[in-house]
Regions:
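Extreme N-terminal basic, low-complexity initiation segments
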Residues: 1-6
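Non-catalytic alpha-helical scaffolds and adjoining flexible linkers that form interface surfaces
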Residues: 7-29, 34-173
């Protein structure tokens, strides 16, 4: 008796933030993404070799917010990604050297904080809003990374008690 299995298209659309890219070969990247519906996932993606090809390396720039289709298989180390598009193209982050440095630092920080984190819509929303604010803001970003890290502590389960704040006090772990 032969059995024929029909697999439905299991691609699910989700938003994702690029946290790490690693060149695997001339035509492939290993990307780590924090997604809205699955938390941290890793995928091997093919990049276009020609300048006119779709899906070039620019779409996988650190902290890009993407809309993608994922065939999520919980038992697999690498998830299969279908269509990908940038939801909010950065206007200033890639072109402003200060913001570019801050974004590289934050990508590394977030990767290390979230690599074992599961699905958390509140974290994803916080990150998406914070990154959009960074891109749109002209001034006052000198301490953005510090404020963002401080606010992330609440999501990670520890945060400073500021109820008894005084000017001579300081945060000491």
């Amino acid at each position: 008796i032969s059995h024929r299995f029909t697999y439905r298209n299991r691609m699910i659309s989700t938003k994702a933030i690029v946290l790490r890219t690693l060149r695997y070969s001339d035509s492939r990247l290993i990307v780590s993404l924090y997604t809205e519906h699955y938390g941290m996932i890793t995928s091997m993606v093919r990049i276009a070799s020609s300048s006119r090809g779709r899906g070039g390396i620019a779409i996988w720039q650190l902290l890009n917010i993407l809309e993608l289709n994922v065939d999520f298989r919980g038992n697999s180390d690498f998830q299969k990604i279908g269509e990908v598009c940038i939801t909010a193209p950065w206007k200033d982050i890639p072109y402003n050297p200060v913001k570019a440095c801050v974004s590289m630092y934050l990508a590394e920080f977030l990767y290390n904080c979230l690599r074992n984190e599961g699905e958390n819509a509140a974290i994803f929303s916080f990150l998406e809003n914070s990154l959009c604010w960074l891109d749109e803001t002209e001034k006052g970003i000198a301490n953005f990374h510090l404020v963002m890290m401080l606010k992330m502590t609440r999501f990670l389960g520890f945060w400073p008690n500021t109820d008894e704040y005084c000017k001579t006090g300081y945060f000491d772990l």
